[in-house]
């Protein structure tokens, strides 16, 4: 995910470079995803107050905001992210320093990474009035991608690997399917377009997404003008407590959509696309734009895991 968002990543942020398999950005992200998102969703006024407190007081109010404080607060820290070591508390300024480094460092840059795309959008645009993307916007997008990439991929990959490991028939099917398109393991991993055509692999990935649910409950939504009637209930317009959401768990476990929903069955996807019923990334105009990006690394990462048995 870091390589997708940034073009130059310091070693300290590469988990595999750490003997502890632990980097400060991942730790902070994990802390954010405990009670923090729940509090922000249901008590936005409380979160606004807490995030304005000095960092020394945040943990006194609630430890749930320590990770968020580390990620979002811009401090006067002078630590260099690209030095040999980095104190954990310096995560408070990680995103800001990474974005600034993307703007100023000399050397090869990945022009297709998220941050470089945002920084150079005004140069690529044909509009004569296009202006540079504000740094605050770039930081916000970088944080969003980092949060999303840290939360879901480990869960989905771990579940898919576990389910395949306990099912010899599934293992054999994946092995044969992959060796048919990748006979020489010394050659590069096949392209995503080719892997996506493999029905069993695609089914394992999508079934893993269905079982892990993504963000289980969507962000708050107020009912529009005129109100609404949902499930037999009248919901008033713009009511401050009228939050309408369909948790993905109940959709993914709906027997009228998925037969035997509690059974991990990758082959169900070969007979039915179920695209509109897989809501881990939500659906509609406001759905997560990273759905296709998420599916691609799951499939390409699952391939080496499956081939290791050979």
Curated annotation (Swiss-Prot):
Q: Which gene encodes it?
A: ppzG
Known pathway: Secondary metabolite biosynthesis
- Organism equals Metarhizium majus (strain ARSEF 297)
Name the Enzyme Commission number(s) assigned to this protein: 1.-.-.-
Among the Pfam families in the record, one is: p450
PANTHER family, per database record: CYTOCHROME P450 (PTHR24305), CYTOCHROME P450 12A4, MITOCHONDRIAL-RELATED (PTHR24305:SF166)
Q: What does this protein do?
A: Cytochrome P450 monooxygenase; part of the gene cluster that mediates the biosynthesis of pyrrolopyrazines, secondary metabolites showing insecticidal activity. The role of ppzG within the pathway has still to be determined. The single multifunctional NRPS ppzA is sufficient to produce peramine via condensation of 1-pyrroline-5-carboxylate and arginine, N-methylation of the alpha-amino group of arginine and reduction of the thioester and the cyclization to form an iminium ion resulting in release from the peptide synthetase.
GO terms of molecular function: heme binding; iron ion binding; monooxygenase activity; oxidoreductase activity, acting on paired donors, with incorporation or reduction of molecular oxygen
Gene3D superfamilies in the cross-refs: Cytochrome P450 (1.10.630.10)
Binding locations of heme: 288
So which cofactors does this thing need? heme
Question: What name is this protein filed under?
Answer: Cytochrome P450 monooxygenase ppzG
Primary enzyme class: oxidoreductase
Q: What are the record keywords, sorted?
A: Heme, Iron, Metal-binding, Monooxygenase, Oxidoreductase
Provide the family line.
Answer: Belongs to the cytochrome P450 family.
């Amino acid at each position: 995910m870091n390589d997708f968002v940034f073009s130059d990543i310091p070693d300290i942020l590469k988990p595999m470079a750490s003997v502890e398999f632990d980097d400060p950005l991942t730790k902070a992200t994990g802390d954010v995803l405990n009670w923090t998102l729940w509090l922000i969703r249901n008590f936005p006024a409380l979160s606004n107050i807490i995030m304005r407190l000095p960092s020394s007081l945040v943990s006194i109010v609630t430890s749930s905001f320590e990770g968020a404080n580390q990620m979002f607060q811009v401090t006067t820290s002078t630590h260099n992210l690209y030095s040999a070591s980095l104190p954990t508390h310096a995560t408070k300024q990680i995103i800001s320093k990474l974005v600034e480094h993307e703007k100023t460092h000399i050397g090869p840059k990945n022009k297709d990474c998220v941050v470089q795309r945002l920084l150079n959008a005004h140069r690529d645009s044909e509009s004569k009035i296009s202006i540079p993307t504000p740094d605050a916007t770039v930081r916000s997008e970088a944080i969003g991608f980092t949060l999303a990439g840290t939360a879901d991929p480990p869960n989905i990959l771990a579940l898919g690997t576990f389910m395949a490991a306990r099912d010899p028939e599934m293992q054999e099917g994946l092995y044969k399917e992959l060796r048919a398109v990748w006979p020489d393991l010394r050659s590069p991993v096949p392209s995503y377009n080719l892997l996506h055509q493999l029905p069993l692999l695609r089914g394992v990935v999508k079934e893993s997404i269905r079982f892990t649910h993504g963000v289980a409950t969507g962000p708050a939504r107020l009912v529009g003008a005129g109100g609404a009637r949902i499930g037999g209930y009248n919901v008033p317009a713009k009511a401050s407590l009228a939050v309408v959401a369909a948790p993905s768990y109940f959709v993914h476990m709906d027997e009228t959509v998925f037969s035997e929903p509690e059974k991990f069955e990758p082959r169900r996807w070969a007979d039915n696309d179920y695209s509109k019923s897989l809501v881990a990334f939500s659906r509609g105009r406001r759905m997560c734009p990273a759905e296709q990006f998420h599916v691609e690394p799951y499939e390409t990462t699952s391939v080496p895991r499956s081939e290791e048995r050979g």
